[in-house]
Amino acid sequence: MRIDVIVNTTARRYERAPQLVSELRIASMGRATFHATRDLEELDRACQQAAAAGSELVVLTGGDGSLMAGTTAIARAFGERLPKIGFLPAGTAAIVSKNWGIQGKPHALLSRIFHAGAGLRTDRHPTLRVRAETARGVEERVGFIFGTGLVAKFFELYYEDGARGNAGAARLVARIFAESFVGGSFARRVLDPLPCAIDVDGERLSRDAFSLVCAAVVRDLGLSMRVTYRAGEDPARPHLVVNALPTAKLGPRMFQVLAGKPIGGEGAFDGLVGQFAVRFPARDGEAVSEGPYVLDGDLLSASVVTVSAGPVLLVVKP
């Protein structure tokens, strides 16, 4: 069986400890084709080489964004005949892989994959297909967790704070939650509704601003936030949660999220969907304006984002 191992060397763990990349390279000798990548161009080239060689298993390693970018590049290179996919988490959060039950040190996980050989177990996992219309053209990605509104605004703060992993994210959440009861400026920066229009399966939702827009194919979005508590229920229909509550009403409902229950409230949408689109309004003097969205921790922007079910992956379980 041909195996390709693709490492994102810019992932935080590998930047801090580059010897880990060397360990993976040595472990792959005689067992897999090894690719060390630094950017999307090198990632695309590695996936194209793997596809041309008929690789049966592509192992990705990095953070959640690396998994999203790698899955996107694999889908682009292989088309409908996708290989099995392995993932070795090496980012700050590793949210998707935790939902998949994959945890451990990259070298140990890779060794288990090699030793299992033909006995490797696989699980089927759904994905999102995300099409973004931007000033640069149309961008298509395959990912797992999409969000705008408070999701995008939270990540803006998270990166401003230095992307300090789960501990840093927890501190931000605690401050937002505390301030939401009194309408503090920090909480309002994140929780106040964001102007946008949303079409769900061809029907326009009634509001013109939303505080939360989130769709995912995994249930725990980090820190035990179970916003998309029905994710994965139907691989062809992602779970979409939309809410328009103002800061003072939305913040206190965090307990609903932790319990994996509907947030509720006037103007809310909560269900499985075939497709939805988020359209950001043009600002004064501009024909088209872009708004922020997040896909697997990567902060992006577009004028229109359309989300539907992506390909189902066969993911190896080390």
Where are these regions (language model features)?
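Cofactor-binding loop segments of dinucleotide-utilizing enzymes, especially the Rossmann-like FAD-
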Residues: 8-10, 90, 243
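Short glycine-/acidic-enriched loop or helix-start segments at secondary-structure transitions
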Residues: 69-71, 97-98, 224-225
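Glycine-rich phosphate/pyrophosphate-binding beta-alpha loops
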Residues: 147, 151, 212-229, 299
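ATP/nucleoside-binding phosphotransfer catalytic cores, i.e., glycine-rich phosphate-binding loops
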Residues: 5, 200-207, 224-318
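Short N-terminal binding/cap micro-motifs at the start of the first secondary-structure element
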Residues: 12-16, 153, 222-223
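ATP/NTP phosphate-donor binding region
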Residues: 1-61, 66-77, 107-112
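Catalytic core of DAGKc-family lipid kinases
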Residues: 34-37, 76-211
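Short, solvent-exposed amphipathic alpha-helical segments in soluble enzyme
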Residues: 20-23, 75-76, 159-160, 229-232, ...
